């Protein structure tokens, strides 16, 4: 998996940062895909600067209904329809996202020509496509807001083909059964247990993508042990009280969460427009002082998971 940041500003766009939108590129060898997390104003325009277009999207996850996370959605849906893309799309989000989509399309005389499914969610597991699971966590914000934890299923370990050949097992259908951990019976009556010839399973990658939030109990569960945590750092540590009053987090709080949750890496985003490049570097330094494995996202930054 890899993350492509389309927008990294908080509240309003700036000359260098658009509002929130993140692509998750699912780099599976046989079932690749592209998911979008939040869709602030101008998201479809930002996508023009990437290798992806709205027609490739399979799923969109909306954290909450504030405009800087949502107002790009109607235009993206309409453009996807105008392009004649027939592939289905599922939108996940809090209560009200269905009404928002229906109202904006109706009042603008617009429609979608592709199958559009809208899932209004609550906290808990919301998706398992056989390759990965998505769990939603309710966060602390003035509007109903969620963060999403995406965890790949573990991959089976490699089959020790050399040892199997030495045991008299020839490549073919039996190898497939053994790779699945099954027990097979050979022509001479011997039974071979696939588990005895498999390397340990490879743990799937994991990422936690937060919506806007002040510190809360659910945040630790959402982030616990993930490879990558994407979290807002709207304001610096000196403005922590103001950040929390508006349902946001400071640099210090975000980095502390990353440390307590034992994540692999922290990626900072959702930066207030008050900070220029020098100010952004100060935000980064505040986070790294607590959690060194921190990166600052810019528009079009790409990070592997």
UniProtKB/Swiss-Prot annotation:
Pfam families listed in its UniProt record: Lactamase_B_2
Record text on cofactor binding: Binds 2 Zn(2+) ions.
One annotated GO molecular function: exonuclease activity
Cofactor: Zn(2+)
Source species, domain of life: Bacteria
Positions contributing to Zn(2+) 2 binding: 68-69, 212, 270
Assembly with partners or alone: Homodimer.
Taxonomic source organism: Salmonella typhimurium (strain LT2 / SGSC1412 / ATCC 700720)
The protein's name in its UniProt record: Ribonuclease BN
Enzyme Commission numbers on file: 3.1.-.-
Record: residues binding Zn(2+) 1: 64, 66, 141, 212
Top-level EC class: hydrolase
Keywords: Endonuclease, Exonuclease, Hydrolase, Metal-binding, Nuclease, tRNA processing, Zinc
Active site: 68
NCBIfam families, sorted: PRK00055.1-1 (NF000800), PRK00055.1-3 (NF000801), RNase_Z (TIGR02651), true_RNase_BN (TIGR02649)
Family per record: Belongs to the RNase Z family. RNase BN subfamily.
CDD domains xref list: RNaseZ_ZiPD-like_MBL-fold
Main function: Zinc phosphodiesterase, which has both exoribonuclease and endoribonuclease activities.
């Amino acid at each position: 998996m890899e993350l492509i940041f389309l927008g990294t500003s908080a509240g309003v766009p700036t000359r260098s940062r658009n509002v929130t939108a993140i692509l998750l590129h699912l780099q599976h060898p046989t079932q690749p895909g592209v998911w979008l997390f939040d869709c602030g104003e101008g998201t479809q325009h930002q996508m023009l600067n990437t290798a992806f277009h709205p027609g490739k999207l399979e799923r969109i996850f909306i954290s909450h209904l504030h405009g800087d996370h949502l107002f790009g959605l109607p235009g993206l849906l309409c453009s996807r329809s105008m392009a004649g893309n027939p592939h289905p799309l599922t939108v996940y989000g809090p209560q009200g996202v269905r009404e928002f989509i229906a109202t904006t399309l109706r009042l603008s005389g617009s429609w979608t020509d592709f199958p559009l499914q809208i899932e209004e969610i609550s906290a808990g597991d919301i998706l398992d496509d056989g390759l990965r699971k998505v769990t939603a966590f309710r966060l602390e914000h003035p509007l109903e807001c969620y963060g999403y934890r995406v965890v790949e299923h573990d991959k089976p370990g490699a089959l020790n083909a050399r040892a199997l050949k030495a045991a008299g097992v020839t490549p073919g259908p039996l190898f497939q059964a053994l790779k699945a951990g099954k027990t097979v019976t050979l022509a001479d009556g011997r039974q071979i247990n696939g588990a005895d010839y498999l390397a340990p399973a490879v743990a799937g990658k994991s990422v936690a993508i937060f919506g806007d939030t002040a510190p809360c109990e659910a945040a630790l569960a959402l982030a616990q042990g993930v490879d990558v945590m994407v979290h807002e750092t709207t304001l610096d540590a000196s403005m922590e009280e103001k950040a929390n009053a508006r349902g946001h987090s400071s640099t210090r709080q975000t980095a502390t969460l990353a440390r307590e949750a034992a994540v692999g890496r922290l990626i900072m985003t959702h930066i207030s427009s008050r900070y220029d490049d020098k100010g952004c570097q100060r935000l980064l330094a505040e986070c790294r002082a607590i959690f060194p494995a921190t990166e600052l996202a810019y528009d079009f930054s790409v990070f592997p998971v």
